[in-house]
A protein has these predicted regions:
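Class I S-adenosyl-L-methionine-dependent methyltransferase catalytic core
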Residues: 1-184
Length: 184
């Protein structure tokens, strides 16, 4: 796992042990940042299921102004901190050890890009989308990027959000959402 582009390009990131974290593949990561390439510079980035921190680190490396990386596990937060130090991006990031719903319940920040890649077997994705819409932390032109397995549907409508395009990369789907009333 490595940083693909930007100031930390080529830096190998530490990966988590065990099966609790499933890092986004380089192929999918590159595709995500190709899709949102014109939105990254100067953005405020939230990774709600941080894992290794690689998606926020990629955003920071490509010019995001700041990032918040949330993960409920102490080991994951330590690993994210290590990866931020490796890439020399610690000063632009905040690592929060918290359950995603607890974090959202107290969040007062607004983000331009929100990345959601929760454990595939859970309903975390749907719950996170609903909560994000309720608390209004997405900027007016912001984008929510959802990663999910090909076999998991995401057919629900979320009040306050407009669903954009779906992109398939092998066994992975990327789905975009924006605030209702904005162009997707």
């Amino acid at each position: 796992m490595r940083v693909i582009s930007g100031s930390a390009k080529g830096t190998k990131l530490k990966t988590p042990d065990g099966l609790l974290t499933r890092p986004t593949s380089d192929r999918v990561k590159e595709a995500v940042f190709s899709i949102v390439q014109f939105e990254v510079q100067g953005s405020r980035f939230l990774d709600l299921f941080g894992g290794s921190g690689q998606m926020a680190i990629e955003a920071l490396s490509r010019g995001a102004a700041s990032a918040v990386i949330v993960d409920g596990r102490r080991e994951a937060c330590k690993l994210i901190g290590d990866n931020l130090r490796l890439t020399r991006l610690s000063d632009k990031a905040k690592v929060v050890q918290s359950d995603y719903l607890s974090y959202l319940g107290h969040c007062r920040e607004v983000f331009d890009l929100i990345f959601l890649d929760p454990p595939y077997a859970e309903v975390f994705l749907e719950n996170a989308l609903k909560k994000i819409s309720e608390i209004d932390i997405l900027s007016d032109r912001g984008i929510i990027i959802c990663e999910r397995p090909a076999e998991k549907s995401l057919d629900m409508a979320i009040e306050g959000l407009t669903r954009g395009k779906d992109y398939r990369y092998g066994k992975t789907w990327i789905t975009l959402f924006r605030k209702a009333g904005t162009e997707v």
